[in-house]
Amino acid sequence: MKSPAPSRPQKMALIPACIFLCFAALSVQAEETPVTPQPPDILLGPLFNDVQNAKLFPDQKTFADAVPNSDPLMILADYRMQQNQSGFDLRHFVNVNFTLPKEGEKYVPPEGQSLREHIDGLWPVLTRSTENTEKWDSLLPLPEPYVVPGGRFREVYYWDSYFTMLGLAESGHWDKVADMVANFAHEIDTYGHIPNGNRSYYLSRSQPPFFALMVELLAQHEGDAALKQYLPQMQKEYAYWMDGVENLQAGQQEKRVVKLQDGTLLNRYWDDRDTPRPESWVEDIATAKSNPNRPATEIYRDLRSAAASGWDFSSRWMDNPQQLNTLRTTSIVPVDLNSLMFKMEKILARASKAAGDNAMANQYETLANARQKGIEKYLWNDQQGWYADYDLKSHKVRNQLTAAALFPLYVNAAAKDRANKMATATKTHLLQPGGLNTTSVKSGQQWDAPNGWAPLQWVATEGLQNYGQKEVAMDISWHFLTNVQHTYDREKKLVEKYDVSTTGTGGGGGEYPLQDGFGWTNGVTLKMLDLICPKEQPCDNVPATRPTVKSATTQPSTKEAQPTP
């Protein structure tokens, strides 16, 4: 039996989707949001804190994923009675009262597989099904099967999934693509948004909003029917990201929305909670304690919001790249997020038109145009010649170049002259022997140099191609694929991230060991293999020599930068 759709009708506040410009109200009906499952740190209170602080497990995620064997209130009561007794053994207490997550079986691929064969063979290995879960499980049920990243990640993750789905589509698994879109739509209907992952402790935040792009991907196979089917969920997700906008005054922020002094509306990353993350409890407490000059709750919120960005962690969010406790994610307006919001507005316009609602389509187009102007005005650093994040504290665009700067090109929001400058900056500052650097800063954090990540390689490749910069796009794909191939030849696996300063080495840094699998690397690798090799002669491994760039398949943009006041 598949888990049913939410049984109680949801009621969601009417969304003034075009209030930003025309102050006309748009009503979107949703159903009444059910009771939100409580995360383990709330369910277990002091017991959760004590277990995590005791470091019973090498990975803090282990206990966050453990399932209570009975009512957590009863377990907590027993703990309070027993904890001060002579000979009390906390590890034994945990073993008796909780079911710990099982280690996944080690997958041993068949000998002699090509890179493509290896990836195609991994899809069933990484597929999970959780139509039903235990009552106190932190895992949230989903109606359809889904593909997980791999390694310690035993659940589905929001933005990872889009790049995984690109690979599923490339392999012809459109049924799995449709299943995953249906799952994310189910989460929007059930919780009002797509959480970071399908765990109760991820519900307080989302991740980079790729749902509309997932629907657009599915529409490549199913046509406009997919756009019309999921239009209500896309509208609900948009409402989540814009929640609170109707009450904002110039210069204010509310949750995920920012209203600048001139009335420009942009978005930021935000987590609704300001406590340590259950899956990184001890690390977050240590980070907060290391900076007594800031309230711990402020640091916790910024750590959580960085997790919402997908870039956890990066010098991009920090004042001092060597000190994580200086991060201030919530006071930064990210260029990648606002590019994705622009794309969401464009797809909403397209879906509304497909559904026969031209008036609503025009309103979404108006919103997209306004956001595009905001991106060009606030998220372009004219002095440096690249897109960058905007700093709400200094009221200036930041100077740091990161791979996120390619997102305006990826969503076709960039002016052509600026896209050309981005191509130069990318080749000069970010391109390395093993692919695209995330940043040029070595901080020890995993979203910094020398690490390169598959989704950013694809965003850059596709974005540069959109503007006719095919040589740089080919360089990125070729360098990254060579890295993936060399690592695979040696270790017979694909990994989460790569050291791009060389080829054949997995990346380092971060809060946990390097993970293999790996969903989004698999997806991007397949897309790139099919990009560099002609369709009439597809390649199963990376060719020995760099292919030449053929005639453009994508029309470059003809937009020029508009002067900003």
UniProtKB/Swiss-Prot annotation:
InterPro entries: 6-hairpin_glycosidase_sf, 6hp_glycosidase-like_sf, Glyco_hydro_37, Glyco_hydro_37_CS, Trehalase_periplasmic. Residues 1-30 form the signal peptide. It catalyses: alpha,alpha-trehalose + H2O = alpha-D-glucose + beta-D-glucose. It is found in: Periplasm. Residues 548-565 have a biased composition (Polar residues). Keywords: Glycosidase, Hydrolase, Periplasm, Signal. SUPFAM superfamilies: Six-hairpin glycosidases. It holds the Pfam family Trehalase. One of its GO terms (molecular function) is alpha,alpha-trehalase activity. Gene3D superfamilies: 1.50.10.10. Induction: By growth at high osmolarity, is regulated by cAMP. Disulfide bonds: none annotated. Residues 538-565 are annotated as: Disordered. The active site is at 312 (proton donor/acceptor), 496 (proton donor/acceptor). Its EC number is 3.2.1.28. Its main location: periplasm. One of its GO terms (cellular component) is outer membrane-bounded periplasmic space. Substrate binds at residues 152, 159-160, 196, 205-207, 277-279, 310, 511. NCBIfam families: PRK13270.1, PRK13271.1. Provides the cells with the ability to utilize trehalose at high osmolarity by splitting it into glucose molecules that can subsequently be taken up by the phosphotransferase-mediated uptake system. This is Periplasmic trehalase. It comes from Escherichia coli (strain K12).
